[in-house]
């Protein structure tokens, strides 16, 4: 425990809270260009090939974004919109790519939760 004189000389400094999505810089979404589209495997109890893309954002950040839904049309140089939201079983993936925005197509034959996957209303 510091003395009062020590506190006068050097006051207590509040710890800065760590931001969960620093690359967005307080924005709800950011635009970026895919530099690499690939699959990766999740952490221990789960098993799959999760689709992810490395994205260079307009502010210069390079982040990894998860591509949700079944099937996608993304390749290198595709322009995508990114939002915050991590994938619990993929270390280092703290962003989601928005479906149905810019170069990313919506999920085909999607009947429920369509807005989350950029799917149009079926006729």
From Swiss-Prot:
Positions bearing 3-methylthioaspartic acid: 89
Keyword field contains Iron-sulfur: no
GO CC terms of this entry: small ribosomal subunit
InterPro entries tied to this protein: NA-bd_OB-fold (IPR012340), Ribosomal_uS12 (IPR006032), Ribosomal_uS12_bac (IPR005679)
Subunit annotation: Part of the 30S ribosomal subunit. Contacts proteins S8 and S17. May interact with IF1 in the 30S initiation complex.
HAMAP family linked: Ribosomal_uS12_B
Protein's recorded name: Small ribosomal subunit protein uS12
